[in-house]
Amino acid sequence: MAILGIVAEYNPFHNGHLYLLEKSRQQGDFSATVVVMSGNFLQRGEPAFCDKWARAEMALTAGVDLLIELPFCFATRSAYYFAKGAVQLLQRSGVVTHLAFGSESGQLSQLQEIAGILAHEPESYKTALKKRLSQGWSFPLARSSALQEYMGGEKKQLQEILPGPNNILALEYLRVIEEEGIPLLPLTIPRQGSSFHSSDLSPYSSARAIRQALYHNLDWEKITNSISPATEKILQREIALGRAPIGPDSLEQAIMVNLRLVSTDYLREIYEVSEGLEFRIKEATNSCGTLEELRQFIKSKRYSLTRINRTLLYTLFALSKNQVELYDQHGPQYLHILGFSAKGQEILQKIKIKSKLKIFSRGSEMKQARDKNPGTALAEMIKLDCQATDVYSLLFPNPATRRAGRDFTTSPVPGT
């Protein structure tokens, strides 16, 4: 039995996601589709536009069968660790056979060749990479340049492939599959429509363009070309209930307050803080009044704005280097079910037989596992996910909806 796996954020679900879903299904005789989806915080270090259950519901209306949450400790990391956590979660489900993903290039063999270099790190490539990093280059730029040097004659092709955000994730999925010998069969579908950074609205608008339109209260008629009627209905409901929209800098005051209260010793223990960055953050905090000012103050040749954004999020959640080491050593420890269709419920029964991971389809199961396993990777991962949900809930526009403990009280979203 072939089961299709996809990794996504669905922030929100749009026509491009539907295109990937439909085109991927055409590549084989798949009995179901399982999606690993980020929770309330995303890979760029930002909160989602609306919560994870609303986004899961959007996907279910489009034909996804089962949605599993990617834990915060992987969902908010760099592309490699995001991909690693997601691919491990699909593999550890015990039932997923294929992994589909979008890419700007659409050339699987080409992407696999590059991913093989990243996985095995030939000596000359490694030397070129270290040289650039020692010169203060950011990791993405250093890696891109080192690959171009190593692959020589394919420089022009690489210059077209490496910057694409979908290609970047595609390479990391393939790299993890190669490194760990994971038996997932990869499929790539060429990306359709506007680039991530485009603000144009079209039938294949980027999620960013749709969010920007919603933040600025543009006419729904302009937005509906990019999303399904079901997604529109869910978005309108969440906005009416005061559970959306959540802006990318909604945590600004919380982060700024926390940074002014903590010490450089505290910051030094935070994941991704190194080479004296704690002093730069502290200096910036005392002289800046907004997150954007803070990011611009801290950014450098080595630290990109996205990396800084993630690091600032880690400071709020006190995500330490030791914690991350624990999470990476053990990988995903559970399957938190966000939603399922009737077919998804059948797949879930198969997962219960084949997977060694704990499965949480009731909040009480999650709470019990956390309380009975103190200090373990399992308990710490659950604790962090629940903290993330509780903090996220405070961002809802409607104060009446901001209660804590929603992971323990919210059931998986039912599909058809």
From Swiss-Prot:
**Is Cytoplasm tagged as a keyword?**
yes
What terms describe the molecular function in GO for this protein? ATP binding; ligase activity, forming carbon-nitrogen bonds; tRNA binding
**Mind listing the GO biological process terms from this record?**
tRNA modification
Q: What is its EC number?
A: 6.3.4.-
Keyword Repeat listed: no
Q: Where does ATP bind?
A: 7-20, 102, 166, 191
> Could you tell me where this protein is found in the cell?
Cytoplasm
Q: Which InterPro entries match?
A: Cyt_trans-like, Rossmann-like_a/b/a_fold, tRNA(Met)_cyd_acetate_ligase
* UniProt catalytic activity: cytidine(34) in elongator tRNA(Met) + acetate + ATP = N(4)-acetylcytidine(34) in elongator tRNA(Met) + AMP + diphosphate
Principal localization?
cytoplasm
- A GO CC term assigned to this protein in UniProt: cytoplasm
Q: Name one Pfam family in it.
A: HIGH_NTase1
User: What are the protein's UniProt keywords?
Assistant: ATP-binding, Cytoplasm, Ligase, Nucleotide-binding, RNA-binding, tRNA processing, tRNA-binding
Q: Would you identify the family this protein belongs to, as annotated?
A: Belongs to the TmcAL family.
- Describe its function: Catalyzes the formation of N(4)-acetylcytidine (ac(4)C) at the wobble position of elongator tRNA(Met), using acetate and ATP as substrates. First activates an acetate ion to form acetyladenylate (Ac-AMP) and then transfers the acetyl group to tRNA to form ac(4)C34.
Among PANTHER family, the record links this protein to: TRNA(MET) CYTIDINE ACETATE LIGASE
- What is the official name of this protein in its record? tRNA(Met) cytidine acetate ligase
Source organism per UniProt: Syntrophomonas wolfei subsp. wolfei (strain DSM 2245B / Goettingen)
**Gene behind the chain:** tmcAL
